[in-house]
Each structure stands twice: as structure tokens, then as C-alpha cells.
Amino acid sequence: MKLKEKMTQEIKALEQKKADADVAKKELMKIQVLSSRFTMEPEQDGKPQPVIRLVVKNNTDTVISRAYLHGVMASEGYSVPWLVSNFFYDIPEGLKPNEEATWAIAPPKNSEWGVLYAPKDAVLTVTPVRVDGTDNQALYDATMFTEEDNSRLEELKKKNL
């Protein structure tokens, strides 16, 4: 196979991967995070427990068994967020279509959440980036097309002109 053909095939594969990720992003918008809040709750051992509280609604037509989430804790007026973190939540019994649920996620005390001391005015924004179905396989995955994929696609397009 010639180099030009190989490059063309790789471009097509990367463009398809990008298109699939774009479809996933659109579908993931149907998973609404209605509210998100971060607190440090007192514990008997003296070290507070970080807790991420979310109210989530599933507006898809499929049961979701696990949600992969992207969280950003930031304050207005600051250009750098206090924390940017990816995390997941296994949903007991799944989140059914049109169902709304409140989740209390308790990250480990020694995680980045456990050492986070953001001011009271900091706001937690949470975005779903992938959800799995009851078969534990990805239903929608916006993370499949990476920055590296995008750079490679741009590089190949320049070379293939």
C-alpha cells in the first residue's frame, strides 16, 4: 500500500472517530446534571470526608449503569480553577430513562478532593463525558477522540494536501 493511500485511510478513520465522539457529545447532553455541590463533611476520625452531591436526570431512552464525569471547581474572577478532575460513579440499579436521582459520591480522603480547600464562593460544574449501559459497555463516549487524535488528524491533512 502506498504512503498516500495509508494516510488517506488514517484520515478517514480519525474523521469517523471524531464524528462518533461528536454524536456521543450530543447524546451526553441528554444526561442533565441539575445541581452539583462539593462539601467537606465532618467525620469521627477528625479528617473531613469530601462529598460530591449531584442531582442527575437521564433523558436518554437507555438505562445507565455507570457515569464518567468531568468536574471543575472554580471561582469567578480567577482564571485558574481550584480543581479539574475526572471521576466515575457506579449507579446502583441503574438510572432509568426519564429518571432523576441524587448521588452522594465520597472520594477517598487522600485524593485530590480530600485536600481541596476552595473558597465558599467556588462553584462545582460537572459534565458527563461517558456513560455505560447495563452491559458495562460504553453507550456514549465523548472521550474516544483525544487531543492526540486531533493533532494527528491535522498533521495528516496538512501532509496529504
Language model features: what each stretch is:
Residues 3-53, 144-160:
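Low-complexity, acidic Ser/Thr/Pro/Gly-rich terminal tails and inter-domain linkers that flank the onset
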Residues 37-38, 69-72, 108:
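Generic short beta-strand segments
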Residues 83-156, 161:
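Short, solvent-exposed, Trp/other aromatic-anchored flexible loops in extracytoplasmic proteins
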Residues 55-60:
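Asparagine-centered strand-capping/turn motif at beta-strand->loop junctions
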Residues 63-78:
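Short acidic, flexible loop segments centered on an aromatic residue
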